[in-house]
From Swiss-Prot:
One of its GO terms (cellular component) is cytoplasm. The gene is citD. This is Citrate lyase acyl carrier protein. Coiled coil: none annotated. Keywords: Cytoplasm, Phosphoprotein. It holds the Pfam family ACP. Oligomer with a subunit composition of (alpha,beta,gamma)6. It comes from Klebsiella pneumoniae. It is found in: Cytoplasm. It comes from the Bacteria. Belongs to the CitD family. The modification O-(phosphoribosyl dephospho-coenzyme A)serine is found at residue 14.
Length: 97
């Protein structure tokens, strides 16, 4: 899946996460995480983001995660929504989600 535009999903409210995804000039996933629980859960957040992007077939993107203590299911949903928006996909492949 190719990222065509910058897109975001989520809010900066408590227990939520804002995910921004856009096209990258360099190959690979460029990931920046800012989280109130980064010291405890930073590695887990990174793993969830990378797994979710891999499931969607995203190989090249700039990703910024601004986490306010979101649950894993919320993080996964926000990453999916932002990636689909950035790819400008209108036809969802539900089996990938």
């Amino acid at each position: 899946m190719e990222m065509k535009i910058d897109a975001l999903a989520g809010t900066l409210e408590s227990s939520d996460v804002m995910v921004r995804i856009g096209p990258a000039a360099q190959p690979g996933i460029q990931l920046e995480i800012d989280s109130i629980v980064k010291q405890q859960f930073g590695a887990a957040i990174e793993q969830v983001v990378r797994e979710t992007l891999a499931q969607l077939g995203v190989k090249q993107a700039n990703v910024v995660v601004d986490d306010k203590g979101a649950l894993e299911c919320v993080l996964r949903a926000r990453v999916q929504a932002a990636a689909l928006r950035a790819a400008q996909q209108t036809q969802l492949q539900w089996s990938q989600l």
